[in-house]
Amino acid sequence: MDKLSGENITKEYPGGITALRNVSIEVKRGDIVVVMGPSGSGKTTLINILGLLDVPTKGSVYLDGREINRLNERERCEIMNSSFGFIFQFFYLIPELTVIENIMLPLWIKERSYRKIKSYYEEAEKLLEEFHLLKRKDAYPSHLSGGEMQKVAICRSLICKPDIIFADEPTGSIDRESSEMFFNFVQLLNKKRGMTFFIGTHNEKFLQFATKVVYLNDGEIEKIKE
């Protein structure tokens, strides 16, 4: 991925609710884009639309010049599985799956081939080792701390080697120590792998290393700082 962009994005919901109004934004390879704004400003909606989890009412999303929001569901899923990673505030780990099974879940959806999935098992173990969780690979989410669950969510977002990671309030439900770990993770992957991040947050500490800051209010961009 060289560039992901949204042009004139508007999102309307039944009942006359407009979550986004004519929003245009550009994300380049290696960017750390931080979207700030109060609750209800449209941060999550923007993440969902750029990440193909939702579609705009009006406007377009482009990936390297290709309009992707009008593709069929299968084509959108292929892009999501190959190019996008997601980290959510509440992690959404499957309680019936072990740590390593949760990490492998995107591969099961993407590959649908046992042989291919098996070859990725070592990759999942390497990620767990990198985050000091290898000994917990067979544990279930109910036995993990908040910080450990966040690390599992991070590993899951990386297993398909995405071009960009979307993070929605990634430090919103974890303690200070785990938040510091996430800040370090973003900076390390950005520097080491050139990983691109698009982060919606209230946490102003992200501003210290953001390459672009977008301020949203009531579904509109108030200003952009680069």
Regions found by a protein language model. Give the residues of each.
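Conserved ABC transporter NBD signature motif
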Residues: 59-67
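Helix-to-loop junction immediately C-terminal to a conserved catalytic motif
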Residues: 51
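A short, proline-enriched helix->beta-strand linker immediately N-terminal to the Walker B motif
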Residues: 159-163
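Conserved ABC ATPase signature
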Residues: 140-149
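Catalytic Walker B motif of ABC-type/P-loop ATPase nucleotide-binding domains
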Residues: 165-168
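Short coil-to-helix segment of the ABC ATPase nucleotide-binding domain corresponding to the Q-loop/switch region
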Residues: 97-106
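A short, flexible loop at the N-terminus of ABC-type nucleotide-binding domains that lies
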Residues: 1-6, 10-22
